[in-house]
């Protein structure tokens, strides 16, 4: 969480290569109730670079990561593995938000300690609703641990 103009902002990292989904996610979050800063990484390599900067105080620590699985350069499973194996990052909630409906993907990501697995709806209003529900759940229902920095 960061502060700007005396207000607390939630830091969200969206790891998504589909620009249409990036735009829809931005719109859904903008229409939500939570003040936020959205950081976008368009591939797994960019996500890992952002998280490297977080470790060294050069980028804000995300309060939530929305992670696609099918990413160029470094796939989402590899990104998830790096996050959850890093003591400094492991407590950040990771929501896998992907087009996959495969039971194998669901099982594997939970075994890798993803906090949620959500299949992206193809319908625009449903997609918007899913993003708003993610926001509501993670920032109004759930109590997250405090972190330093």
Protein language model regions, located:
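Conserved acidic carboxylate
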Residues: 16
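C-terminal output helix
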Residues: 46, 122-134, 142-147
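Hydrophobic residue at a beta-alpha junction
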Residues: 71-74, 83, 92
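Active-site residues of response regulator receiver
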Residues: 68, 98
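Short, glycine/charged-rich "phosphate-handling" switch motifs in NTP-dependent
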Residues: 115
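Acidic, metal-coordinating helix/loop segments flanking the phosphotransfer/catalytic sites
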Residues: 4-5, 26, 40-64
């Amino acid at each position: 969480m960061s502060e700007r103009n005396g207000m607390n902002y939630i830091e969200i990292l969206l790891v998504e290569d589909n620009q249409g989904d990036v735009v829809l996610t931005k719109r859904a979050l903008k229409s939500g109730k939570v003040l936020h800063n959205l950081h976008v990484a368009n591939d797994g390599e960019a996500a890992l670079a952002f998280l490297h900067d977080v470790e060294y105080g050069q980028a804000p620590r995300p309060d939530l990561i929305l992670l696609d699985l099918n990413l160029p350069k470094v796939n989402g499973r590899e990104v998830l593995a790096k996050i959850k194996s890093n003591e400094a990052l492991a407590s950040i909630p990771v929501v896998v938000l992907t087009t996959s409906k495969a039971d194998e993907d669901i099982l594997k990501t939970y075994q890798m300690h993803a906090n949620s697995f959500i299949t992206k709806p193809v319908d625009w209003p449903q997609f918007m609703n899913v993003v708003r529900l993610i926001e509501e759940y993670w920032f109004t229902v759930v109590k997250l641990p405090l972190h330093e920095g």
